[in-house]
Amino acid sequence: MNPSKRREKAKNRKESGRFAQLPHVVLNSPDYVGLSYKSKALLVDLVHQYNGKNNGDLTAALGTLKARGWKRSATLTNAVKELMKAHLIIRTREGKFQNPHSRCALYAMTWRKIDECEDKDLEIRPTATAPRKFSLEKQSKHPLLKA
């Protein structure tokens, strides 16, 4: 019996498929809470691209995100800048626009380790741990974080 069927039988439930994971420690951080709605929406769309092994290969290119409702590259650029300033994402590859070798910038979520992304020419090496460790940060001053 395959693992999916075993789980369904053991837990009496079906597999739910892929999901986008945003940990509470990130959602409750002052950096996230202080974001504009557009930056929060972009973060969700970047997390949506994550498949468990491609952190570092997430794109904010308009061509990719048009299907998710984005209309202006300037809006995306501003949201990316805000997410980077808040240290919620980092750029793993600089975009360049030279014919015929154009390529988009790539990003990684800071609360997950950066993965090996073959053939992506990342400028940041894969990591064993997340670049940012939210659980170790002092966050007691923020009202949403008090127990």
Region locations from a protein language model:
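Positively charged, structured surface patches that bind polyanionic biopolymers
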Residues: 1-36, 121-135, 146
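Winged helix-turn-helix DNA-binding recognition segment
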Residues: 49-108, 112-113
